[in-house]
């Protein structure tokens, strides 16, 4: 049998039906003629490339084994640059992942078989390269450790989603425990000592980076929230799995919080650090955090989008051979760290099984349809117009309110919905408690008119 790593591009393992390899006409690939979803499988180990059809106009290229490996990311990047340099007619765009590359193309301009031959040839050249290196900026970002916005998100999660989660009330304590670190200071030291390499952008939106420390001994691992948070402050910094992410916008989320930083996205594009693009970071940037107070971060976040806060950005190069040499030199320490970390991770999961936290099931159910107490003369009820959970009660019986004042805040469909006082008056009764389920039409507050 022919060795895939030495075969010529036109003879690589392919499941496409036989036909002219370089036809200038559009090629029709019949689904029923395909023997497997994989239409190309070449190379071995970290030089393996698998191609799958992804719809009618996309080709998904997967590199190596499904594991976190910087070598795979660098080779994927090199393949993307090689295909970009060819400026192929019919290729619309290229989208890189951590160990993948998706090719969006027009099959009527570039037949699939021809595209596969080109990909295989370029992959050969990438794998043969002896000195693979990329530009790698070092971007110094301020980090407000355990920022109040992160604490608020945890508080809200405990009130409306899951109060007994293993990562509550402190994500940092959870990170310490699941990584077998001696104290919270060591968690902080690890995060600030790490150099987080940006492996991908747009995780999940607005230029948010997915990054991991270059030194494996800085790779803190965590599980994600289950269920997910319904609210996360913009630019919160969290760890999920072995990846660090900066949330590009306010929204739901699941990564474990360490703090908050400045904006990753600037729609106005008028700040020098963004270099004319709306997203701040680039592939293979190295993020290095430095500590600031919560108040300092408020000022930085105010000034940065206006061009009044200058980032410290250094320019460097990341060389694959040098990085592999570093891993070899530090192999013993890296192996010991991973063994200790894995033991702590497994012990944490065993504790969840023992105490019943491993199989979480929401018990919030539906608010009981109890009979409402009748209103007295001069009273007015304030009813919920939507089903959800009660997040906050802003008033207490006896409080005087004016029309338009917020009485309670509901959470429904990952949105905060305030219920407002319809009249000037005095609060007579609050019939719900934070964290309780509320049905549509349920009476929540009773007011008496002035």
Residue positions per predicted region:
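Loop/turn positions that initiate beta-strands
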Residues: 1, 284-286, 398, 404, ...
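Conserved "landmark" site that anchors the functional core of diverse proteins
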Residues: 1-4, 24-368
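Short, low-complexity intrinsically disordered segments enriched in A/P/G/S/L with frequent Arg
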Residues: 11, 15-26, 44
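Acidic, low-complexity mobile loops and tails
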Residues: 365-408, 418, 424
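Exposed loop and linker-edge segments at protein-protein interfaces
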Residues: 394, 400, 429-432, 437
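Short hydrophobic beta/alpha edge segments that flank linear recognition/processing sites
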Residues: 399-420, 439-450
